[in-house]
């Protein structure tokens, strides 16, 4: 067996044990949509700069090159101040709408071109959401007696939404209603059961259910006027091609990812609270996939969770950066950083194909491996790996008691 194949097998076995913990949370960043051609936005895109030139000069000076988030944050703050003074905000609204239109157009993964690095991938040629679907299928293979898995994403795009819909997975995303879907945070506490067949009246939890949180908002979220039936003034629209941002109906995005002093309002305060609650439960594991650790709010919550002895952090992000290197340098056995230079492990596509286990298949292989180890007692590498990981998990349980 080659060294790379052995390492992949060991990593899959380790990931399998973590997926079978009671509290499993995934944080998906921009890297999970990279292969679909969705942009990773840092600076104001060149195609948008002419429409934002005056605002950039006003807030940052001539020749400045601010981030998309910083510019949008300044526009929001200026809009708030002018509204308080009773001044016109038409010019600000027009720039904000143009920025959101650009985002809406370029983050629509139904229309983006598959990244050139994946032009030869036949799976993507047949189904652009193939890897999102496989990822979800594997995540839902966890035993049904465990708590629901949590999927958090910082992405505005609809890639996971489309994949969940295609698979027929019911996802609890904080909205209620059919024709008029409004944000109601209490929905996150709901679950889905169906009556059992026994005469004892027991109920059984439905399968194919996932808790889904879009921490920075979504292309499908629209800010509207509050009403008795929509207290928070947030609607979820169907992405059928008939909607685009307007001044009176702007899409909901949260651009202030680098501003820790920004006051979080609903729905973002609720989404961040849910994230903190999810990863600070005993025996929790957090998989950060395609997340570059550029959001200080999220990072603070993750760092706080590291104070819990039984918490495990798994990072899969192609190309290392200062923040991930800092975590790696801690040499904490609870922090697992997949090789950031190996695209077969640390990209979303590579992680789904080579690292994330198929729990059904792995269980069958484990049975076969155990049988072979009994027949040939001198060959025990897989069994030893299994024991090491079980011991690791047991040690964490003892530490948390």
Regions found by a protein language model. Name each.
Residues 63-93, 100, 142-251:
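Extended, H/D-rich, highly charged conserved domains that either
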Residues 1-26, 32-36, 202, 261-263, ...:
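SIR2/sirtuin-family catalytic core signature
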Residues 231-273, 278-281:
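Flexible internal linker/loop segments at domain or repeat junctions
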Residues 1-3, 119-125, 183-187, 259-261, ...:
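Short, basic, glycine/proline-bearing loop/turn elements
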Residues 1-164, 169-173:
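Gly/serine-rich nucleotide phosphate-binding loop at the start of the catalytic core
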Residues 26, 211-215, 258:
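Short hydrophobic-aromatic micro-motifs
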Residues 31-32, 156-158, 216-219, 293, ...:
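Short, flexible loop/turn elements at secondary-structure junctions
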Residues 57-59, 181-194, 315-325:
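Short, flexible loop segments at boundaries between secondary-structure elements
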